[in-house]
């Protein structure tokens, strides 16, 4: 255990203590350091399993923080949509433009407290790089990153490491990779390398989506 390990006795409400005890009973440790401000982007990595969601949700309930999270809009269809939104979900269209990024950044800053959780891999399956949306959103809104990891090898859910982006993508991604070094998802071979996709050549035709 380290100085950031959270214990049930330190939590103020019964529901928070219960959520943390459930995590502890499952063998998990929760690390937490107070957030650096009222707005920011929580980057969650690695994301290789559906089990990440209930583990993360218990951590969210234990901390008593109303983290919002982003997921593709198709997951919000039907009766589950209302439940997903109640749990903090924000539906997004994956075809969204930079204009939509600016709009989301302003929406986040217009409220008193808003931290948005994003899985930069965008999928539980392997992909060769991270999606860059989290980076553009953080730099547009000028907010810090919270680097959350779900490490199945050590059974640690960590909500403790933060980073203020410099705007130098290479430098920033190296700093992010240093925090996540050695952290292992449930299916390690499905975790994406910690790097952003190279910029698209504007001369190439844009692929049409089905």
Regions found by a protein language model. Give the residues of each.
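Helix-to-loop junction immediately C-terminal to a conserved catalytic motif
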Residues: 11-47
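Catalytic core of membrane glycerolipid acyltransferases/transacylases, capturing the structured
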Residues: 33-96, 152
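Short acidic/polar alpha-helix capping motifs at helix-coil junctions
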Residues: 4-6, 18-24, 43-49, 69-70, ...
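Surface-exposed charge patches
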Residues: 21, 58, 82, 106, ...
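Non-catalytic C-terminal accessory region of glycerolipid acyltransferases
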Residues: 1-10, 14, 18, 97-210
């Amino acid at each position: 255990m380290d100085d950031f390990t959270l214990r049930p006795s330190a939590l103020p409400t019964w529901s928070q203590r219960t959520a943390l005890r459930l995590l502890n009973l499952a063998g998990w440790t929760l690390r937490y350091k107070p957030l650096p401000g009222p707005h920011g982007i929580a980057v969650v990595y690695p994301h290789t399993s559906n089990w990440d969601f209930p583990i993360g949700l218990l951590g969210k309930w234990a901390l008593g923080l109303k983290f919002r999270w982003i997921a593709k809009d198709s997951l919000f269809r039907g009766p589950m949509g209302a439940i997903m939104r109640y749990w903090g979900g924000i539906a997004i269209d994956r075809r969204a433009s930079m204009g939509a990024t600016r709009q989301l950044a302003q929406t986040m800053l217009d409220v008193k407290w808003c931290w948005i959780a994003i899985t930069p891999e965008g999928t539980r399956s392997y992909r060769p790089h991270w999606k860059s949306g989290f980076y553009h959103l953080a730099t547009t809104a000028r907010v810090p990153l919270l680097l959350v990891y779900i490490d199945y090898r050590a059974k640690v859910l960590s909500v403790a490491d933060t980073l203020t982006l410099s705007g130098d993508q290479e430098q920033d991604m190296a700093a992010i990779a240093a925090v996540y070094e050695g952290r292992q998802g449930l299916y390690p071979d499905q975790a994406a390398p910690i790097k952003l996709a190279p910029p698209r050549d504007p001369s190439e035709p844009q692929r049409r989506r089905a």
